[in-house]
Amino acid sequence: MISGATNIFKIPELKRRILITFLFLAIYRVGVHIPTPGINGDALASFFKQMSGTLFGLIDMFSGGAFERLSVFALGIMPYISASIILQLLTVVIPYLERLQKEGEMGRKKIVQYTRYGTVVLSMIQGFGIAIGLENMRGTAGEMIVLVPGWSFRIMTVITLTAGTAFIMWLGEQITERGIGNGISLIIFAGIVARMPNAIAQSYELFTVGQMSIITVLVLILIMVFVVAVIIFVETGQRRLPVQYAKRIVGRRVYGGQSTHLPLKLNTSGVIPPIFASSILMFPLTIANFMPKPWLEEHPWVQSILNSLGPGALLYNLLYVGFIIFFCYFYTAVTFNPNDVAENMKKFGGYIPGLRPGQKTAEYIDKVLTRITLGGALYVSAVCVLPTILYARFNVPFYFGGTSLLIVVGVALDTVQQIEAHMLTRHYEGLMKKGRLKGRRG
């Protein structure tokens, strides 16, 4: 692996792409620390301390800490992700978008353009909502977060946050085009990884004051390593369906006749299900934080429901697993259509041995996909619920939740695979000598 890594610097284009990627990520991290005008930073920091474990924490994770500081990049890349998901869902119900999706490169460019428009619209709506919300928020000492409330602040905030999101979106596209890896994913990756030094420092502080024993630290490290190993194993795992292409004679040339496979990932839906599940479960707790405390004291049943929906509670974990499994199936059904796959195979003379091309093939693919999606959903549930159980068991902060680990490991694997592909096409030794994990055939 070391010799493979040294080969990176022997390929000028690959070296240039990696340097460009680091440059754009550095620009992004600088922007995270540029504050939005008109904000009382101390009051905002004290407000966010009491909002831990709510939807704000999830948004802050995807913004790389920018939301907590309310910097110009406070919205992060979430509006772009939301717009992409909405477009994917709309392709199922709107025939025009479905046709665009099947038109190849031109259709894809059109959908990307619509996604950009959607990102700007969502950023403006969210920016206005944040501006209104900030005007009504107070710090722990009762101080105002917004220095001068009014329409001038609202308009300035909308323009600033929308421009920030548009710039992040542009950075992501530039990384994808000129750098290495998926730009949007790498921006989220950089935001999560940037918190590591602070998390390690806080853990060390807990250890030095005696709140964490050496055994607890070792157990947490071992569990982290184990979870990362499981994520790597599952994310690289595939179920490979054998595909045979019939021979075709065109003039004097013979086409087809080769054997290949259709790879089905165990976790087709990625990190979208836990994100959706977390958003739904954190919403009631987020709303409750804006409720007057006297009103909550007058209605103890509301407080008991909120306590049972808090991270780490049994009901929370059960609902979390249920929502993850549901969204795994739902998102897989939206993004992977067995009928389209079977139709494309039939069009190019491909078939799965023992099955008739067309409907029978589609039914078989759907059956296999349904089976492996259950395994993938249970795996995602275990990875995401484990941190909350650890928090309750050891009573220590678990700074990197399951969603964060899934994103970090998944993006790292994807980037390494792209670097390896660049090296292998130029006949250099890759980062990994042996082939990747092979899926079970048939």
Language-model features: locations:
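N-terminal cationic and glycine-rich segments that engage phosphates or anionic surfaces
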Residues: M1-Q101, M106-G442
